[in-house]
Every structure is written in C-alpha cells, then in structure tokens.
Amino acid sequence: MIIVDNALKAREQQGKPIRVGMVGAGFMGQGLTNQITHSVPGMRMAAVYNRRPERAQHVYRYSGLENVTMAATQAQFDQAVRQGLSTVAEDPFLICRSGEIDVVVDVTGSVEFGAHVILEAFKHGKPVVLMNAEVDATIGPILQVYARKHGVILSACDGDEPGLQMNLVRWVKGLGLIPRVIGNVKGLQDPYRNPTTQQAWAERWGQNAAMVTSFADGSKISFEQSIVANATGFKVRSRGMSRGMKYDGSIMDIHKLYDLDEIRALGGIVDYTVGPAGVKIFCLAEHPDPKQRHYLNLYKMGEGPLYPFWVPYHLVHFEAPNAIARVVLFGDNVAPPLEGPVVEVCAVAKRDLAVGETLDEYGMYTSYGEAVNTEEMNTRRYLPEGLVDGCKLKRAIAKNEVLTYDDVELPSGRLADRLRAEQYRHFSNATWLDEHLQRTQGAANVRSEACA
C-alpha cells in the first residue's frame, strides 16, 4: 500500500522493525508468518502462541525459520524476543504483557478466547489487529469502548473482506460519491453444509473443515458483513441478506438487483451475492452532482444513478501486514464501528435439534449464522452464532428456526456473555441479557464490567 511501504522501509533501515505477536497458528497464521518473514521489510513475527505449541513451532519452520525457542515465563519470553529468536509462547498472555511486542494479532477465530486475549492486550497498552471476524461481529463494539478506555486501537485487517470493503468505501467516498450498497461475493452458498461434506475441500487446501464449512454455510460472510454494517451504519434489507441470490451477469448491471429508493430509506445496505465471476467485493454508489455524473458516463462507468466499483480478489494474509503497519505507524483503524452494533449474526438451526442437545460451534453440524438488524436481534433476543458452542437446548428446535436465549442453557461464567450484556446496556440501555444471566447463572454475572 502506498505510504505504508515507505514507512516500513524506514523502520527496516532504522533497525526497528514492528514486532508482531500472533495468537493462533492455523492456516491463516501460517500464511501471515511466511508473508511477514519473506515479503515485509520493517516487520517481524516476533512471537507466536497456539494451544498446541508444536503448531506454533511449525509455522516458523514452514517459513524457513529454524531458531525457534519455547518461553514459559515472562523473563524467558522477553529475552528471547530481544535476541531475535523465533519465540513460541507457552501462555498467550506472555505476548500481551511483553514490552518487547508492539502489536498483537488475533488469528484464533474464537469469540471467548479472543475476548480474553484482546482485553489482556489492552491492559498492557497493546493495539490489536483482528483476523477474527467472529469476535469483531459478536462483541466488537463494546471491545472498541475498552480500546478507547486504554488508549489503544482494535482494528480489522486488510486483505479479508471487511477490510477490503472498507478500503473501497473510503476510496469511493474520496471521489465524492455516496456508497449505497456494499457487497460481498461468494462462489457457493448452502446453509446445510457441514465438516463432513467439506472435508475433501479442506484437505485439498490444508484448511480446517469447520472453517471451510463456515464459508459454505453463510456464517462467515454474515460475520463479515456485520462488521461492515457496524462500520458504516448500513443495514440489511431482511434477515439473511439476499440468502445466496445467484447473479451471473455483468458487474456493470448488478445495480438492477436493488431498488435505490428502498436503499436510500435504509441509509444504505450490506449484502452478498453468489457471483458474478471475477468480482470479490463491490460498492454501488451514487453521485449528487450531475456534472460529475456526465464525467462518470464518459469514463465508462454507466449512466447511473448507481455506479459500480469492485475488487476482483481478496488476498487475506498477503495484505494483512498493511493493517498492522497502518495501526502501529499511523494509528489508522481499518473498520471501526461507528458506535453500537447495527447488524449482528443470529444462530439458525441447521437441522432438527432435540431437547438436551449441546450445540457445537459455528461451521459445524447444528447451526449456521445469518445477518440481522440489531433491532430485531435485541427485541427477539436471538442467540448470537458466535456464542453457540456449548449451549444446551431446553426445547426442541425445528430446522431453520432462529435460536433465542430462552431456548438454551448457556455455559457458565463466559466473559463473552458478560460483554454481550454490557454491549446491549451500553449502547441501547437494554438490560434483559443482564437479567437473563442473573436469573440463570447468579449475581456474579450481573452488570459486571468485564474489564474493570
């Protein structure tokens, strides 16, 4: 990215590379480590934590780094990083607490675990870059409150769809246009996919079958569009957005899928389609100046009133270092929520579910996520897809039925549940989730400031 590349080169010349501490060493963490190691001057992957330490060791060696050392104490950790060793932390909080780390990157995909890591990083003055759309979509707005409280930044990443879309939105606004539709493009949508159906694909690319399932069943794209909605104030037309509407026409004609008056009335929408080919994300925008509309037509953008802008790819870990540099060097947040949540992700039954069943996590066998406007989510007390794991059903649920908090017994003592309750209370003065936690789990979970 222009400006970022020169700033990173300057850090390299000064011998002061950005020291990255990464939590999570899966497929994306592996790619990010390799990218930083070989293609990003002025930055180094100083430390990695993974629940299975051998996986953290692997991502270093995958990247050609052999000077790998384990660190069990803060003193061991800090010394190893100072010495320039490829450091594997036995505890993620060693990364968060170290004065030798400049920024924490969360690549876990976990809401509960991610929340603990993020808040610990904040306590020690560390900015956090998220490659964890799930935590951002579920409790991102309240985590931003804590980031501001501690004077740090919590940012989405470049390369992944939310960051890619917000970069495009900022660019389009810079041209003087008004974004109206921000769209994400998929190649497949089937809410009933599961790790069994996706196993072969996952093995082919060396990915986790549950994560691949979350791509196919619509959960991941719902998390992503929720982040974009919260960063722009845009809504969804209805729960589930366009639910896999297939479009194989030209990107120049995709505006025909949308009624401009309806979209204006909503203040803009986030959406997704299956297709068209050659497009990964798009933004439809209008221009208020008829003189400029004349020029846009001349420049082959069509007659309007909605003009298409798009990016044909998303390169995830190739571009993620740009976000790290933007945050550390410029204090530039990639996709911060404007304020409270605007769109959230509710849990929907993937099959008929029996009373007493325990739900598995997103991307598995029991549920899928759909984007829904916060007013509906709050009023109907839907269960968020990011927090389904470990919930026990109190009644039978039919396939395609939205799950609510009243339908489940929550796992006890989760930080993320307290943060959800605080998020509703802070932004909408709604206390029903506080009351629900008090009724079902006792006073310890009531109105507790999660990071006080």
Spans of features found by a protein language model:
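Structural detector of well-ordered beta-strand residues that form the stable sheet scaffold
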Residues: 89, 129-130, 155, 180, ...
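C-terminal catalytic/substrate-binding lobe primarily of soluble NAD(P)-dependent oxidoreductases
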Residues: 2-11, 201-446, 451
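Rossmann-like NAD(P)H-binding beta-loop-alpha module
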Residues: 147-220
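Rossmann-fold NAD(P)-binding glycine/threonine-rich loop
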Residues: 108-124, 131-152, 157-159
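Short acidic, glycine/serine/threonine-rich loops at helix termini
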Residues: 60-61, 140-143, 166-169, 184, ...
